[in-house]
Amino acid sequence: MRLRFYYIPFMRLRTYAVAVSAILVAIALISMGTRGLNFGIDFTGGALVQLEFQQPPVIEEIRSHLSAVGLGDSTIQHFGSDREILVRAPIISDESAAAMELISLIRETLSAQYGDQMDVLRIETVGPRVGGELREQGTYAILYALLAIVAYIWWRYELNFGVAAVIALVHDVVITLGIFSLAGVTFSLPVLAAILTVIGYSLNDTIVVFDRIRENLYIPEGKEKPSIISIINTSITETLSRTILTSGTTLIVVAVLYFFGGEVINGFAFTLLVGIIVGTYSSIFVASLLLVYWRPRYIEPHLKKLQEKPEEVV
């Protein structure tokens, strides 16, 4: 299904797109610089205890009980139903004995107050050294993914297309992380996996648009040569129905996961929900927009080469 009979001047909105992207990126960077990300114990190290009470507990009471035994810096929040509580406490030492002592202290302190009205549902521990290594490896995973993308698009198209795609992907990741920072959503290993998924999904949209742009750059001899902006607008319009269908159906599934999948998968679904929306926007208004601004130096020579060697268009 293609939109054959309509021409939508997307690049007419490029000034507004630049302003919107600049504002969103600035807000994201400021938020990450001031508030930071709410890293889970996967990256910071610590003990996690999930508790279920017979009656909805008061978080301030639980915090008061834990503060009395030196655990005042613990994070306490509802998880799932209003009868379930998640307690996260930092671990200073990498020794397994220290983790077990911390968990025992949490259980004994709360059991003394609530007795058989409380059940322990889940216990997790990650040492601070392991958490730091996971955070470092996660950062490298994103960087390696971006470098691999540049290499692939450089080989498949040209370097300027690869650079434009990576800038758009960095734009997507920064805005997604900024929304995470503003919302205070816990950043865990499943969320990191979702970030990498968003990078791949956004790149897929961008490649579809770039491929159509490259096809439309070739103008048979004797035909009037359209402007670069016109070529890009036409290319985006021709791929728009595909973008709407794929992004729309994926968003429906992700929205169902977010609203009905439960707390365990909530962060993963939230990342995909935000990332797909931002990625769809960037494939239209960011990656293609960079080609418009680079046209005198990069695109015009490419167009000239295609006129001389049309067989290079595959």
Swiss-Prot record:
Repeat among keywords: no
Bilayer disposition of the protein: Multi-pass membrane protein
GO biological process: intracellular protein transmembrane transport; protein targeting; protein transport by the Sec complex
TM helices/strands, residue ranges: 17-37, 137-157, 158-178, 188-210, 250-270, 272-292
SUPFAM superfamilies for this protein: Multidrug efflux transporter AcrB transmembrane domain (SSF82866)
Subcellular location, record wording: Cell inner membrane
GO MF annotation, one: protein-transporting ATPase activity
GO cellular component: plasma membrane
Sorted UniProt keywords: Cell inner membrane, Cell membrane, Membrane, Protein transport, Translocation, Transmembrane, Transmembrane helix, Transport
Pfam families: Sec_GG, SecD_SecF_C
Main localization, broad class: membrane
Task performed by this protein: Part of the Sec protein translocase complex. Interacts with the SecYEG preprotein conducting channel. SecDF uses the proton motive force (PMF) to complete protein translocation after the ATP-dependent function of SecA.
UniProt similarity note: Belongs to the SecD/SecF family. SecF subfamily.
Subunit structure as annotated in this protein's UniProt entry: Forms a complex with SecD. Part of the essential Sec protein translocation apparatus which comprises SecA, SecYEG and auxiliary proteins SecDF. Other proteins may also be involved.
Protein name listed in UniProt: Protein translocase subunit SecF
Gene source species: Desulfurispirillum indicum (strain ATCC BAA-1389 / DSM 22839 / S5)
Upper taxonomic lineage: Bacteria, Pseudomonadati, Chrysiogenota, Chrysiogenia, Chrysiogenales
